[in-house]
Amino acid sequence: MMAERVIAIGDIHGCAEALYALLEIVDPTSADVVVALGDYVDRGPQSREVIDQVMEMSKLCEFVPLAGNHELMMLDALSNSNAHKIDFWLHCGGEETMASYGGDVANIPDSHVDFLKSCRRYHEIETFFFVHANYLHHLPLSHQPDDVLFWQHLDDVPQPHVSGKTAVVGHTPQLTGNILDLRHVICVDTFCFGSGWLTAYDVLSGELWQVDKTGNVRLDSQW
């Protein structure tokens, strides 16, 4: 049975109040597919609470969590004694994540680590595909390199993908707070951890929901 809605959620970055408010207005059901585009952690103050929330989302809908580069950095730091890799993660927002766990790695539940490890590289449906950051237009999704899939910004807009599907991505913050819609690629990272919004976007209908990091809903007349 085809989903009633296929909803992409942009980069959350530790903004649990925004995620809670967004889910309240989107109200996902078992008839919906929700694809989270990664970067649940870092920068915002509530990474632990965000992971708690997203781990519960499979009870509400068909939930597809993608991995972002910040999840990769966190997992790399937790599994590695290399001081450079740990410092790199902390500098990129990991300090806020650690603070949400009381500043102690021992407070990070195994279930949270297991969730981060379970996040997918990509997801695709008939006419759309979802990745965290970017893609190489000539390669199938299964052959995309990590540095592009998780790290490459949209500074150089990719050509339409060989599959003919529209790409839905996060990672490149849209500082205006508005989604970037180039027809063949749509970016829904709208800078929630800064002065923007957390966005949910139904790719089937084009319906859009946005809240700021304190949970205020953006009204239609504001965009």
Give the positions of each predicted feature.
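N-terminal active-site segment of His-dependent metallophosphoesterases
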Residues: 1-53
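Short, glycine/acidic-enriched loop or turn micro-motifs at the edges of active sites
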Residues: 13-14, 42, 71-72, 135, ...
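Short, glycine/charged-enriched secondary-structure capping and boundary segments
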Residues: 21-24, 49-52, 79-82, 144-146, ...
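Active-site neighborhood of divalent metal-dependent phosphoester bond hydrolases
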Residues: 43-124, 154-158
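A general structural motif
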Residues: 3, 29-31, 60-62, 126, ...
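Residue-level marker for buried hydrophobic side chains located in beta-strands
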Residues: 8, 34-36, 65-66, 129, ...
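Acidic, His/Gly-enriched loop-helix segments that form or flank divalent-metal centers
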Residues: 91-197, 203-221
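Active-site glycine-centered loops adjacent to acidic/histidine catalytic or metal-binding residues
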Residues: 11, 38-39, 68-69, 171, ...
